[in-house]
């Protein structure tokens, strides 16, 4: 029998620091919001998300592992995620108004930090508008 040749490639997963409104971060940390929604997909493969609670809190409060990333029309993604979206249908469709693509990060292994951290702990001097890569 001839031996099979193959190439094994490790897919490197990046960590993303995501700026999120404090109330939505709280829903994630409480387990009420299982998906984080975005309008576009980053270029890098994301394996972990660090949560920065934006103003007025302005602290890094937790993290989660990304189980999977869903991409599709806003209507398709809502039909899959609505039961654990942690946001209202009106808010969701308002967010995606005029957009043809929706991205949803399914979160698992969510951790709330016992002591919130500063952005400077991650070598970051300014809060990201949306997100930044940490590695």
Predicted regions and their residues:
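Short conserved beta-strand and strand-loop elements enriched in small hydrophobics
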Residues: 47-54
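Contiguous surface segments at macromolecular interaction interfaces
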Residues: 2-45, 58-61, 69-135
């Amino acid at each position: 029998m001839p031996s099979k040749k193959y190439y094994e490639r490790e897919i490197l997963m990046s960590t993303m620091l995501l700026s999120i409104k404090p109330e939505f971060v709280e829903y994630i940390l409480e387990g009420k919001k299982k998906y984080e929604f975005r309008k576009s997909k980053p270029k890098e493969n994301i394996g972990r998300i660090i949560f920065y609670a934006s103003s007025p809190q302005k602290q890094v409060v937790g993290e989660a592992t990304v189980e999977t990333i869903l991409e599709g029309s806003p209507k398709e993604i809502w039909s899959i995620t609505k039961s654990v979206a942690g946001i209202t249908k009106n808010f969701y469709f308002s967010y995606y108004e005029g957009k043809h693509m929706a991205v949803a990060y399914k979160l698992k292994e969510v951790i709330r930090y016992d002591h919130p951290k500063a952005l400077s702990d991650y070598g970051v001097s300014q809060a990201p508008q949306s997100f930044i890569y940490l590695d």
